[in-house]
């Protein structure tokens, strides 16, 4: 059996968490990632019959029974993941009862998955119905995206439109726009359910005055979605107090979307 620490999915988690910490998106123990894995690939590294312990998930997910995820741990600092993955990450499988996680590897210090696991699993469930290839759900606190929450209306159309205006690539990268939730208590099933509802329509969901959720087929795609929003938010924050001389017109955004063949939110443009 291969060494689990050499598995591509473990390396991806280590590299991505380190990068997110480096960028200042995930201070202290902020942020979390869950990654849906292929059972056959995991079996190359772990005995799938060896369940270390079971942990209640806090909600029922019958659609995800048997699914295997690698998930960041609760209270864990992203800066420590790369040097100590076995304590900071865990590989779990949703048990047959749909409400329990079977720990197959990790959380070696007795810890468990992120407190936001309900929001992650509910989002996976929602995105898989829209896109069966969805694999990653990522939550972080990008500085400029969060700052923008305090000075811009938290309206999906208006916020998306502003972000699209900031960089030529934005309407191409996230043509489906950005969903928005008001401030809600984190770590609860309620915010998980609200996020999952938005995930039926958007791959990106702003948690008001808190951070952002992203979902995608790969780690790179998901990271890139959040990265692009953060760049747009940075440009907005750098320019919002200055006179606007130039902008990308709605007709030009439409040109971009149609040239690159993306399915964009036409109702978010003022044409």
Language-model segments: residues:
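Glycine-rich flexible loops
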Residues: 1-271
């Amino acid at each position: 059996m291969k060494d689990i620490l050499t598995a591509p999915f473990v390396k991806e988690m280590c590299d991505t968490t380190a990068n997110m910490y480096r960028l200042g998106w995930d201070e202290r123990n902020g942020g979390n990632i869950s990654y849906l894995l292929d059972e056959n690939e995991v079996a190359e590294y772990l005995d799938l019959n060896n369940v270390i312990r079971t942990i209640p998930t806090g909600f029922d997910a019958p659609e995800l029974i048997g699914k295997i995820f690698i998930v960041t741990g609760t209270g864990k600092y992203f800066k420590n993941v790369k040097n100590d993955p076995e304590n900071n990450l865990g590989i779990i499988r949703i048990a047959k009862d749909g409400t329990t996680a079977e720990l197959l590897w990790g959380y070696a210090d007795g810890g468990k998955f992120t407190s936001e696991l309900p929001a992650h699993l509910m989002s996976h469930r929602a995105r898989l119905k829209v896109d069966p290839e969805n694999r990653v759900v990522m939550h972080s606190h990008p500085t400029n995206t969060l700052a923008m929450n305090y000075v811009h209306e938290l309206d999906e159309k208006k916020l998306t439109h502003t972000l699209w205006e900031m960089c030529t690539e934005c309407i191409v990268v996230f043509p489906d726009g950005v969903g928005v939730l008001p401030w809600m208590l984190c770590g609860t099933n309620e915010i998980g359910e609200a996020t999952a509802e938005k995930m039926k329509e958007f791959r990106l969901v702003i948690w008001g005055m808190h951070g952002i959720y992203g979902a995608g087929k790969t780690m790179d795609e998901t990271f890139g979605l959040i990265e692009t929003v953060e760049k747009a938010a940075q440009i907005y924050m750098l320019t919002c107090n200055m006179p606007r001389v130039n902008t990308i017109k709605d007709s030009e955004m439409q040109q971009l979307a149609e040239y690159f063949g993306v399915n964009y939110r036409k109702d978010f443009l003022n044409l």
